[in-house]
Amino acid sequence: MKEDAEGFIKSLFFGNIREDMVFPFPRLEPEVAETVAMMQEAVGKFADEHIDSTKWDEDAAMPREIVDKVSELGLMGLLVEERHNGLGLPMMAYGHIFEKLATYDSALTVTVGAHQSIGYKALLLYGNEEQRERFLPRLATGELIAAFCLTEPSSGSDAASIQTKAVLSEDGKHYT
């Protein structure tokens, strides 16, 4: 079999990544591509001015102000519809923007990515309109940070057997 006729999965199995079959990503619609280019430029400028990965690693903490700043850029609501304070971008645009952010700091990328992918994705896909109206605007602006709690002592990481419940504190300000 000729090398150029070898399938992607087969070549991947043998440790050969056929970049010609992966890159570039499929083309974006022109107006989305323009938005992505502007977002990537803004991410680069933001990163150059504000990201200090070494300090964050030394402090074992990322300042909340950083999350506030990426929220101001719109990065916390890339997939949320505009009517809910998001940018309403397609997944491909999300991928391009995250590719840029990941070149600067993986911890920030995971924070922003988890918020949208495993954090509020179920709300986007399965939430009713009342739930979307209640939560998405604040999730898209970073006022709320979405989370997904999976591992617990009695079930490990088996999501089907989780028994933990969130209980509102007596002062009504947070859940435990």
Per-region residue spans from a language model:
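A short beta-turn/loop motif at secondary-structure boundaries
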Residues: A61, D68-K69, S154-G156
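Extended, charge-enriched "interface" segments that sit outside catalytic cores
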Residues: M1-S53, A60, E65
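Short coil/turn segments at secondary-structure boundaries
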Residues: W56-P63, E82, V110-A114, T151
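Glycine-rich, Trp-frequent "lid" loop and neighboring beta-strands that shape
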Residues: G86-L87, E130-T176
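Conserved active-site and cofactor/substrate-binding residues in soluble primary-metabolism enzymes
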Residues: M38, A61, E65, M92, ...
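N-terminal cofactor/phosphate-binding cores enriched in small/glycine residues
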Residues: V36-W56, I66-E82, M92, H96
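Internal helix-loop-helix
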Residues: E72-G142
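A generic alpha-helix structural signal
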Residues: Q40, V67, F98, R132-L136, ...
